[in-house]
């Protein structure tokens, strides 16, 4: 298997000659530096201010709690804030919350990436056993495509019918398109079915707003259509 | 393997001080590398409860960088200025977008798998709710659109509907049974199977898929070039004095009234269509139900047609009022060739 990257190598710390490489290196290293600074502030309760000029002449700055306070402090200016401590404690609390959110989102991303990798691996393993209909639509010939369209149209009828049946089972009082319903039932919101006993996660594909909605619901006022 | 550090204040003071000292060195080192490699100016001020503020590269260096910074217009200063909060918010936004994208990809992959499992008759292997079925319905629409685009592309490029290689020999079914006894099946140009009606049988128009349309045995006008579905005759099911023809199946009616009479949320509950492959169910009545293309698509579980041409069932037509009689005295076996 061919390596995708060059891996970790010892980089000679001298000015780079190639302009494009230099710009890319700057962007990546700047991002890494700011990340380190962010972690540093969170873990050690330190205050930091950084100013970095780019090769293109732009100026980037990072500061905790912000750049101005520390620059003023360094230049010997006295900033007249009566409630500095209050601001600081609020900032700390907010940063703490943001860090928590960031950690959660990051964990979710990793989980989804693992799912994606395992799916890709399964697909690679089953590649040889794959039937023609599992291929990409562009790989099918005319007769196969025509056949597949026919089959999928019939499958769609079955799926739609079954979805309606499931809704009736989970909410027997819900009558499709009935004007007697004063408000949308809890199981349905604007034509998007939220009842899910399935193995798919709730954060699935969102319904296309241009799609014709099932079950007589108006997406704007969320009341059953007559 | 490295353990992940929880992003929160280190509770132990000694550990916190050690971490501060090490990480401070790391940051100054990274700054040095960045400025050297890219030939840019940078400065940093680090202060903490443990020691005096640290400046990098030096007090003069910081003052120079700060004065350069202050010379810039206020808009330019604030444009790329980040506080810790704005930095984290920015990171959260980026990660959230990434997460949405990954979820969409994974969901589509799930739905694709679910769709093909339904097609192959493995629907009972899944647990699903109404939301899943609605998403699947939308995905099927999306997939059909892709297929339609593909068909348009292939049609415009003049592609043949059948990609199977031409058969090695011409197969003639029931040639010795007398004229009109059985239809002759001849593989036509472009590997499009052509059913040619035997002499004396009722005329039948058949067009080869992808081939030039042929009018056989005095049939009506030839079909349009892009019309892929020839007229399919009903095949007799019982051969007696009164030939009975199989009635066409109202598939939609069957769906609405037959299949869903005993629906259950229980995932183990078996529905009539769950164990048999979906396509097999579609192919139950291939002549009435499915067009020409589906017959030749060579789906193993659809119709058991493992050959490169379509062979309708060979029917021994007995003497009836509906069909021309086999008169032994006038029977001549003809070898039909299609040019």
From Swiss-Prot, chain A:
Locate the compositionally biased regions of type Basic and acidic residues.
108-127
**Matching InterPro entries, A to Z?**
TF_MADSbox (IPR002100), TF_MADSbox_sf (IPR036879)
Residues in MADS-box domain copies: 6-66
GO BP, sorted A to Z: chloroplast organization; embryo sac development
Disordered: annotated segments? 108-131
One protein family per Pfam: SRF-TF
What's this protein's name?
A: Agamous-like MADS-box protein AGL23
Q: Which gene encodes it?
A: AGL23
UniProtKB/Swiss-Prot annotation, chain B:
Key words of the record: Coiled coil, DNA-binding, Nucleus, Transcription, Transcription regulation
- GO annotations of cellular component type: nucleus
* MADS-box domain sequence ranges: 1-60
Q: Name one GO biological process term.
A: positive regulation of transcription by RNA polymerase II
Q: Which Pfam families match?
A: SRF-TF (PF00319)
User: Mainly localized where?
Assistant: nucleus
Q: Which CDD domains match?
A: MADS_SRF_like
What task does this protein carry out? Answer: Probable transcription factor.
Q: How does it assemble?
A: Interacts with AGL61/DIANA and AGL62.
Q: Which PANTHER family match?
A: SERUM RESPONSE FACTOR HOMOLOG
Q: What is this protein called?
A: Agamous-like MADS-box protein AGL86
Q: Which organism is it from?
A: Arabidopsis thaliana
